[in-house]
């Protein structure tokens, strides 16, 4: 995630939620808004679990994003962890995330 910045305001989240594309995958929901900026946010609500579980889920999603980062178009990305993320293996999550990003046409 060297090239991507974090979201800084609620307005950025709102704009991506309202205008951006959305795709549900197993374990994660992906929001994407094509933009000249490169920004990312990883979210895990309390439905996912306690703090340790939420933080682990976010770390996993950031690691997967770092794997695909160089192949992705510029834009704003939001990854929302679902509660079933804890039951999936890393390789299964990687496959699901790659499939979802392809469906949103995020790859260069």
Curated annotation (Swiss-Prot):
Function: RNaseP catalyzes the removal of the 5'-leader sequence from pre-tRNA to produce the mature 5'-terminus. It can also cleave other RNA substrates such as 4.5S RNA. The protein component plays an auxiliary but essential role in vivo by binding to the 5'-leader sequence and broadening the substrate specificity of the ribozyme.
UniProt name for this protein: Ribonuclease P protein component
UniProt KW keywords: Endonuclease, Hydrolase, Nuclease, RNA-binding, tRNA processing
Pfam families reported in the protein's UniProt record: Ribonuclease_P
GO molecular function: 3'-tRNA processing endoribonuclease activity; ribonuclease P activity; tRNA binding
Any single GO BP term: tRNA 5'-leader removal
Subunit details: Consists of a catalytic RNA component (M1 or rnpB) and a protein subunit.
InterPro entries assigned to the protein according to its UniProt record, in alphabetical order: Ribosomal_Su5_D2-typ_SF, Ribsml_uS5_D2-typ_fold_subgr, RNase_P, RNase_P_CS
Gene3D superfamilies membership: 3.30.230.10
Entry's family note: Belongs to the RnpA family.
GO cellular component terms given for this protein: ribonuclease P complex
Class in the EC hierarchy, top level: hydrolase
EC number: 3.1.26.5
UniProt catalytic activity: Endonucleolytic cleavage of RNA, removing 5'-extranucleotides from tRNA precursor
SUPFAM superfamilies: Ribosomal protein S5 domain 2-like
């Amino acid at each position: 995630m060297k090239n991507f910045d974090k979201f800084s305001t609620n307005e950025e989240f709102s704009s991506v939620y309202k205008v951006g594309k959305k795709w549900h995958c197993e374990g994660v929901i992906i929001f994407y808004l094509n933009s000249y900026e490169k920004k990312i946010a990883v979210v895990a609500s309390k439905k996912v679990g306690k703090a340790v579980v939420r933080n682990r889920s976010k770390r996993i999603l950031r690691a997967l994003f770092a794997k695909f980062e160089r192949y992705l178009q510029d834009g704003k990305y939001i990854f929302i962890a679902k509660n079933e993320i804890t039951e999936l293996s890393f390789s299964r999550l990687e496959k699901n995330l790659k499939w979802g990003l392809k469906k949103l046409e995020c790859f260069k």
